[in-house]
A protein has these predicted regions:
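Register position in tetratricopeptide repeats
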Residues: 19, 57, 87-91
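Charge-rich, low-complexity linker and terminal segments
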Residues: 65-66, 83
Length: 91
């Protein structure tokens, strides 16, 4: 399976947990299987965005901040990640 296809499957599965009211399970799935290599492809950015969104949904502000910070450092214009990072409560 191609890496981008595997990433999309992870995103769909993790997002399904969020849709079922279990965003922390989606975050756990992504953290267990997703990697953040030195050479990034678009699917790595999508994985980080999904992790940040699900962490925020789960009330894990620190986890959301970490995922969105990593993403914004790689690509400040990726979707609305910069805005989402700014809107997260401090601490």
């Amino acid at each position: 399976m191609q890496p981008d296809t595997a990433a999309e499957l992870l995103i769909v599965a993790a997002s399904a947990y969020g849709d079922l009211g279990q965003p922390a399970a989606g975050v756990a799935l992504l953290r267990r299987h997703a990697r953040w290599p030195s050479e990034l492809a678009d699917h790595h950015l999508r994985l980080a965005y999904t992790e940040g969104a699900l962490a925020e949904q789960a009330g894990d502000t620190a986890g959301a901040r970490k995922a969105f910070t990593r993403l914004v450092e790689a690509d400040p214009s990726f979707y609305d990640a910069s805005d989402r990072l700014r809107r997260l409560p401090a601490g």
